[in-house]
């Protein structure tokens, strides 16, 4: 059981983040590495010795209480010393004169219009008065990234809560006056969307020589794309506080988009989509629900795309054993003994996840995350195989991909920081403090799939998955989308997978995956793609993306 406590201490949720392959560290190392001060009430609560948490523990199931007790007994002083909120990133705020535009949320909030009944109402809904949006035109030639494309970067500021979210916008290479706009979100929680920009689907990658390399398969080939670093203290974003649950970030994203489209009304009437991967399986249902809840909005949300996401842990965790043991289309990674162990652990894991679903309390959701990650992810992780690509060992750094180190080196150059207006002193691909915070808030195992039926009543949803990923594998993603209860469930469940082929270039007819679609729900399996489909299969990625935003499965 020592592995359980170690997983707790470094952030058990890191097992299913993008990217974090670390498994074992000495407790003393971890405590020293993560020790920071915090006055947060949650930190104070969780730092209390477990024997003092009598009222909280009364509500636990026996399984959840056992997990907490095991951790307490093995490391009796540990929870007194581990903080649960990250310290602010070092930063220097640039003067207002540095920015080309500043959009004041209070000004937008005070715009009133007359409705069809002759009554006065606000032009857009939501609480915006504490937010500002700072905008800087990026000189493409200064960075060598898509030099013929308009780019903007800046910050959304929540002045009341000292939160500052960084974004970087790239206009479409094709027809920016008519092409849709897409918000891209990486997961983690705690990983920068600039990783998606330079590692997966943006206009350039970064080579070994720390120079940009043109990407012909960029998603801004036929769409304008916003890459957002969220939650705060991720990438170039920063705050004096911290965010530790998905719902808290949803209102920030709504404010960002509202003010962005107010500053750039030329994009506001175009179709808008939200796309992301991994922990974005939590983010996207929450963010889309927040946007759709505002009937008066300037965000023309048309669909959402979730790639290799974690959305329904109860269903998805069942498919770690099949994927690791040879039933997912690739050779087995684990031996029969390890596979039997995972089979034996599944019942307890799902029982604990169900308790989390029923209460949505940290006191049941945290133990579910700890136990299930240790029992069902741990055996695979300990083999050293890449959790994001079952075909490969984890090589290079703890992130498994050397290219990520090139990206960090590039983004930490003074000329790059200046060109995009970054206000933090340094860039990191992932902030593991944030990852731990979300775990201990109970966010990891919460049932975000319950938001999807409401979204499906209004807009289409695409669930896509590279079939070589282990951590958020295609078996689990297909299973939860098949099981989802919504108004079109019966028709969707009866729909069979069909071949997905390239349709209109020199590779016409090439099979790139499988697809099933009915009503507003579509699932895709992408052959040969790992956790980051655009990285492994760039041509196939752009193919399905262009056809999706073009309306092939959304009409």
From Swiss-Prot:
It comes from the Eukaryota. The active site is at residues 278, 469, 531. Residues 1-17 form the signal peptide. GO terms for cellular component: fungal-type vacuole. The keyword Disulfide bond applies. It is an enzyme of class 3 (hydrolase). It is found in: Vacuole. Residues 18-136 form a propeptide. Disulfide bonds join 191-430, 325-339, 349-372, 356-365, 394-400. It catalyses: Release of a C-terminal amino acid with broad specificity. Pfam families: Carbpep_Y_N (PF05388), Peptidase_S10 (PF00450). Keywords: Carboxypeptidase, Disulfide bond, Glycoprotein, Hydrolase, Protease, Signal, Vacuole, Zymogen. One of its GO terms (molecular function) is serine-type carboxypeptidase activity. GO terms for biological process: proteolysis. Glycans are attached at residues 222, 520. Its EC number is 3.4.16.5. Vacuolar carboxypeptidase involved in degradation of small peptides. Digests preferentially peptides containing an aliphatic or hydrophobic residue in P1' position, as well as methionine, leucine or phenylalanine in P1 position of ester substrate. Belongs to the peptidase S10 family. This is Carboxypeptidase Y homolog A. It comes from Talaromyces marneffei (strain ATCC 18224 / CBS 334.59 / QM 7333) (Penicillium marneffei). The lineage of its organism: Eukaryota, Fungi, Dikarya, Ascomycota, Pezizomycotina. The gene is cpyA.
